[in-house]
């Protein structure tokens, strides 16, 4: 496919230099459906990006679109703060019946604001309030958001530098396999906790991603996550799982921690929780932690009722019968087999992932960007991941068809060959 660079003048002259994704994908997109986007010139692109994980069910999913249109056409509440509404009630009841009860999860539900970093900030605030401590432990290559509290537990040096002030009360520890298996799990962490001279203040909580999406598709082993939960219990620290990108079915189960059999004290959800790409986030926590005073944490747009409508619809449509998890794992197997074949032909590459999130890394760290650039030329949207953008990240919609997935994987294989 030959793509003529579009007229981007208004974006280049008026919009801030902070824009990023559009620099790698120089097109003006006009419409989208399922796993495909179309630009204003009629070029079609297969989407292996899915709105950075916000579009697990594809673009303009017809089931969700119908529910949203019906709600708007009857003049349903749009802006509701934390007032009781029929849309919020329907979502809460559906979430409880379809997600929480079948998994025997007792969580209370908080609507902290519309974005993922709102959810993380509320989780950090609550953990500190409950424990009466300031420090929170995070992990190397973590990403938890771009506001100050979230940045303090984020690893990426470039993003941290944007804060412009010291980021305090966050301490990084080695993520799973950070030392390539040469150091026992949590050796350093436990030594610091037990040594009164280590200089580590007793943490209120530990925050972790089961798969580090922005950090390079680093996958924590189930046994590592179980050991982390046991460590938190022994040391009386709360365990926070940031499931903003890896939750809502991305790794197979609705929650990414289900495979490990752990029950975090606090869970953050956003991105695909609304199902339609509408802003929405949740902070879930065990009932005994619900010590908030009314209004102690709030936000103008925490009551985004159209998002509640699509969120309830997606749970009914995709999670009530248990088929979504099976389908995602089957699609993941399809990806894994293709990546095995690609890496067999490309000895400098390796891959890792779970469900429908995968990463491919090359010895030449610049190769990932070259692969993604060539993919765009061929009509496939891929992004990079990792602190040096050294990983090609595959994040297609969960609803992608086997044929579309195969098409995208064939394009990926071609890009790997052509950038060698």
Swiss-Prot record:
Q: What EC number(s) are associated with this protein in UniProt?
A: 2.6.1.76
GO terms for biological process, alphabetical: ectoine biosynthetic process
Which GO molecular function annotations are given, in alphabetical order?
diaminobutyrate-2-oxoglutarate transaminase activity; diaminobutyrate-pyruvate transaminase activity; pyridoxal phosphate binding
Its pathway, per UniProt, is: Amine and polyamine biosynthesis; ectoine biosynthesis; L-ectoine from L-aspartate 4-semialdehyde: step 1/3
Gene3D superfamilies associated with the record: Aspartate Aminotransferase, domain 1, Type I PLP-dependent aspartate aminotransferase-like (Major domain)
The record's listing under NCBIfam families reads: dat (TIGR00709), ectoine_ectB (TIGR02407), PRK09264.1 (NF006733)
Instruction: State the family it belongs to.
Output: Belongs to the class-III pyridoxal-phosphate-dependent aminotransferase family.
Q: Which cofactor does it need?
A: pyridoxal 5'-phosphate
Q: Which residues carry this modification: N6-(pyridoxal phosphate)lysine?
A: 271
Uppermost EC category: transferase
Transferase recorded as keyword: yes
Q: What is the official name of this protein in its record?
A: Diaminobutyrate--2-oxoglutarate transaminase
Task: List keywords of the entry alphabetically.
Answer: Aminotransferase, Pyridoxal phosphate, Transferase
